[in-house]
Amino acid sequence: MSKELAKTYDPSGIEDRLYQKWLDKKYFHAEVDHSKTPFTIVIPPPNITGQLHMGHALDNTMQDILIRYKRMQGYNALWQPGTDHASIATEVKIIQKLKEEGIDKHDLGREKFLERAWEWKKEYGGRIISQLKKLGSSCDWDRERFTMDEGCNKAVTEVFVKMHEKGYIYKGARIVNWCPVCNTSISDAEVEYQEQAGHFWHIKYPLMNEDGTPSTTEFLTFATTRPETMLGDTAVAIHPDDERYTHLHGRKVLLPIVNRVIPIVEDAYVDREFGTGVVKITPAHDPNDFEVGKRHDLPVINILNDDATINKNGGKFEGMDRYEARKAIVEELDQMGLLVKIEDHVHNVGTHDRCKTTIEPMVKDQWFVKMDELIKPAREAVKNGEIKLIPERMEKNYFNWTDNIRDWCISRQLWWGHRIPAYYCDDCGEVVVAKEMPKVCPKCGCTHFTQDPDTLDTWFSSALWPFETLGWPEQTEDLKYFYPTDVLVTGYDIIFFWVIRMIFSGYEQMGEKPFKTVLFHGLVRDSQGRKMSKSLGNGIDPLEIISQYGADALRLTLITGNAPGNDMRFYYERVENSRNFANKVWNASRFIMMNIEGREITEPKDVNARPGDCWIMSRCNNLVKDVTENMDKFELGIALQKVYDFIWDEFCDWYIELAKYRIYHAEEDAEAANDAMWTLREVLKKALKLLHPFMPFVSEEIYSNLCPEEASLMMSEWPVYDESWSFPEAENIAEHFKAIVKGVRNVRAEMNVPNSRKAKVYVVCEDQTLCAGFEALKQSAIMMAAANDFLIQQDKTGIADDAVSVVVPDATVYVPLEELIDFEQEMERLRKEESRLTKEIARSNGMLNNEKFVSKAPAAKVQEEKDKLEKYQQMMDQVKERLEGLKAKMS
């Protein structure tokens, strides 16, 4: 027995109550159950510093749709939640808080700083989780993990030690991306390239004569965008096959200002076609130069401190900021006559994606992951289709990264994060990598060690997320059952940071892929197509949208029209449309439930006798098939649009209207009313099931009132295609019927006929099947077409010659003109319109005949008046034609 719904849908009063019910009933929880097929998604763990933004809302809505869909299909669906410790982001937040208290991080000390960090995590870390719950996310919150919890810490240590033993992790002096503000190295994936206006400084170095003196007539000229790095130059390079410089092989040049003699080296790295074909080589501050330096055994001279000021190797420039030094060096070169010219140049500059500071390539002792072997199975998995990327075009970006891989710098000069499990003997400096502090040095026997102060890149622990959350390194039942996971849903912007690293980590640690499919989504932009950012002030808070319109409206807005990998624009108007759709579903459901309340509804004895019922059942059945296919192909936006169109157009605007006559005349034909109400209820149930993954709250609230005997819509079975609900003939009849009703409505609208004025509708059709169907729908047609009769016949017998006709497929519809309009009233209306137009034409002619107006008014204003006059004259011609026609009929 269904219950009556409230008059209006109020999401604020419903969503929290329903979500708590789902939690209390443990509907989100998954346990190992070998009688069911598992379906697993791991959440991209949001940062504990984070607050829900539109990107999170889209990402998690997509995941929730998939997990709810699979849960309803009978899968043992696990959505594994958790949060990320976010090393740099969190440390920056804590440092800011300490500054507000007048406390310096280093004065506080590492131990106290970490205490504050854990306090911060406790206070703010759960904020984004509670916000995800507001969205309706059906994660298994009993399994919530944190990338620095005990289990994850154990997994990270295990991986580091194992990979070090296998030679994949090493420590060495290599070029790293150094952030002088955050005072840490960052990975290539964390470098964001920004187009900046700069310069090419063309500089010349004197050649050295055979007697050891610098030439005053021979120079080598090159161009650089970073003249300050010349302080660390240890060579200049030319291409070995460049005939212009063959005579310089083995020669040297003088490095000005520093007065260091450096060699000319021949290296194929040099592009002969670019500039002069000469390149300065600074191994300490350029990754390509570093490689050249290794090939030619060049010294590495670092000229920068960690804060990007010049160090002691910079001589008299020591202590200067890098940009101050640049200016001073250029001025001195100019005074020396060694600055050839300065050229404007726009180029891409590497910046830290967190703080937007220009990074400095620097040689540092860091920990690295050797990538050349690790990346091979990750590349092959996508190449052979073992892992599918959606959309497929993402493969190009994926292979571009795998094919140009560099070793991954994983050490960070931070305190918050997984500390590197490497220990240095206090006596001999021996490095021991181990799961815990060694007791005795294997080299000298010392018993005192100091742990490496650095922490690991955040993405090192995140790369293990698909299996560490299931208990790895222990071989748990969860791990055996739920791994590999099925789908990863993520933004295309972290394909390098996270996706690729999870893939190679899965193959290396588990010997298997971490997931079968990666579903990429784009960015949510503002209505102008701009990226949402604090600086533009165009960010939209999802929680405000939820508070005002409800979570379902936000979810519908984010998914409607969304295609994998594509950016989308966010419009408030679309949220309002989504809210209106929720209200439409609510009101339609309320109408149905009010009418079936207290009635014993039974399955129709002969559904075939009701073409309208057969039509909506068949359309619903086709919808089930189509939506299921779309969902299985991850076409969530297409699937939702089909559900939306069916509910709004076919079910609400057509079928409910079709059914009303039988419902309102139940006393005259109880069986017909029963069949209509049974169809309404059963189709609504299926429609709500199809809608549920997208709009879980409104669908659950309606369903729980429609079917109070069932536990929950979210635990009900997903509909399947049913041959007994397939009625192609009824669909054909209904489509013709709809065309007839639309045609009559259009005629009435064009002639301004109010619904209160009824008219006969004649349908001339020779197809007997269609005629029988139209006859069965006769009373509904009378209601829907504002008719006083609906007559089906095979010819035009009895139809007036002046009847208005509408041609539809396989039939012609006629409406007698005299029944549509009252001739006397229409004559009066037309005469009034004729009088009004006469005045408007006179006024317009008066203005256009006025020389002052024509000569002094703006040209656009004059043209506007001419256009008006032309329109009035056309309208007058039509009015006169109608008047003449009516006079002829009345005579």
Q: Over which residues does each language-model region extend?
A:
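N-terminal catalytic cores of NTP/NDP-binding nucleotidyl/phosphoryl-transfer enzymes
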Residues: 31-94, 147, 156, 222-225, ...
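Alpha-helical support elements that line or immediately flank enzyme active sites
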Residues: 56-58, 287-292, 501-509, 643
